[in-house]
A protein has these predicted regions:
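Active-site SXXK
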Residues: 56, 70-88, 167, 258-263, ...
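Short, well-ordered beta-strand elements
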Residues: 105-107, 231-233, 244, 310-314, ...
């Protein structure tokens, strides 16, 4: 019981109680959780569902059927669907093809393609051809809609709203490394990958005072769909090195320009770069094979990576319905929830795979029903292995539930005004428990 109570201190810290409520479950636990809810004196709406996975019966319920925004708890559905439709050993392929005097970089939706991976492809190509007239970019494995339904139009350059493409690299972001310069001079800012695809203007200032600082900002001209970055504001002269990530516009062209620069580094000259769907008579020059999907799934859940979630969804659509778009992928997810988890999907709304959209609506009971189904499924262990553990490094619960970490595996979720936690508690008293 101790572990469930500590868990619900977390839940009610971001929620409040109605003045009068009727709930169900274990009498002892109900009294203690209700007392925590009442004493919180906060003012938000909440839904709670705790279900014993031994008996299938509720241990505690409060507004459990109320539809609320799940935020990144949507990734629970996405992860399970990827394991079901694609499999833990699914691989993403990025190909370089040859056609006459041209080369084609063909994306396969790899969410974890790195700059190093791209450079290895460039090196392999440089050993097989002497020159390239045009580098064509083929991202047609998935559709060209960059942003999900209901994503806020003014998210701007933030990393969590990176555009989605079958040709993605470095999370479709630039990493800026910021540290103070000499007093009165600009901050020292380096960025990776170092590419001519972006422009960069540094108007920051290093100062000796540590109060009333003008916040240092790195912005992109996102409203005009450009990759012109500017740095403004102040930095204290004793500040530590910091890393800031910002997304880029047109990830396909970003990946293509990077690849062109790498090919040139390895001795090739390329005259043009443009987008084009590959024809059938092209020969393969080089291929990058991703790590197994389970590795990307772990990254999805522990880092709450939105790009990975949406690439999973579109790839599910491509493999299951032959159309690599959000509708096909989400229809597949809803079908899985309805047919396998026996959830009435007409009573929920799934607008994307990551939970960024505020159009998503799910109840706590739907989430615990889903978690109960996964617990009995063939990929139970794989799914649970991807979930962050309390107090475990490199996960979204790294600073939470440190003492109880061995008993809790759960996914966080957060938007402005929204905070969620769903997963499993392995309780010495109640046995395995699903909660949301």
């Amino acid at each position: 019981m101790k572990y469930l109570l500590i868990l619900f201190v977390l839940l009610v810290s971001c929620s409040t109680h109605p003045r009068l409520f009727s709930n169900e479950g274990s009498l002892i636990l109900k009294k203690k959780i209700n007392r925590l809810i009442v004493s919180s004196e906060l003012g938000a709406t909440m839904g709670i569902s705790i279900v014993s996975l031994k008996t299938g019966k509720p241990i505690y319920e409060l507004n459990s059927e109320k539809l609320l925004m799940p935020a990144s708890n949507n990734k629970l559905f996405t992860c399970a669907a990827a394991l079901d439709f694609l499999g833990k050993d699914f691989f993403f392929f990025t190909n370089v093809l040859a056609q006459n005097e041209n080369a084609i970089l063909q994306g396969g939706g790899d969410p974890d393609l790195t700059v190093k991976d791209l450079d290895s492809l460039a090196y392999a190509v440089s050993k097989k051809v002497d020159s390239i007239d045009t580098l064509f970019l083929d991202d047609t494995f998935l559709d060209s809609v960059y942003f999900g339904n209901g994503w806020m139009w003014d998210e701007g350059p933030w990393w969590y709203a990176a555009p989605i493409s079958a040709l993605s690299v470095n999370d479709n972001c630039i990493d800026f490394y910021v540290q103070p310069g000499k007093e009165g001079q600009n901050a020292i800012i380096n960025y990776f990958p170092n590419t001519k695809y972006i422009s960069f203007q540094n108007q920051s200032l290093t100062v000796s005072r540590n109060t009333n600082l003008k916040k240092l900002k790195i912005d992109r001209d996102w409203s005009d769909k450009k990759n012109n970055f500017s740095v403004t504001g102040e930095i204290f002269y004793k500040e530590e090195l910091d890393t800031l990530r910002r997304n880029i516009h047109d990830p396909t062209m970003f990946t293509g320009v990077l690849f062109k620069e790498m090919l040139e580094k390895h001795g090739l000259e390329i005259n043009y770069v443009m987008k084009k769907k590959v024809s059938r008579n092209a020969d393969t020059l080089a291929t990058h094979k991703s790590l197994p999907l389970i590795k990307s799934a772990s990254n999805l859940m522990n880092e709450s990576d939105n790009l990975t979630a949406e690439l999973f969804i579109k790839t599910i659509g491509r493999n299951n319905i032959t159309q690599g778009n959000w509708k096909s992928g989400l229809d597949s997810v809803k079908s899985l929830l309805a047919s396998s988890a026996l959830i009435d999907t007409s009573q929920m709304r799934i607008a994307d795979g990551s939970g960024v959209s505020r159009y998503n609506l799910t109840s706590a009971k739907q989430l615990t029903t889903f978690l109960g189904w996964v617990y009995e499924s063939q990929y139970k262990n794989d799914f649970i292995s991807t979930l962050p553990g309390g107090g475990k490094r490199n996960g979204t619960l790294e600073r939470r539930l440190k003492t109880e970490g061995n008993y809790v595996k759960a996914k966080t979720g957060g938007l402005s005004g929204v905070s969620n936690l769903s997963g499993y508690v392995f309780s010495p008293r109640y046995g395995p428990v699903a909660f949301s």
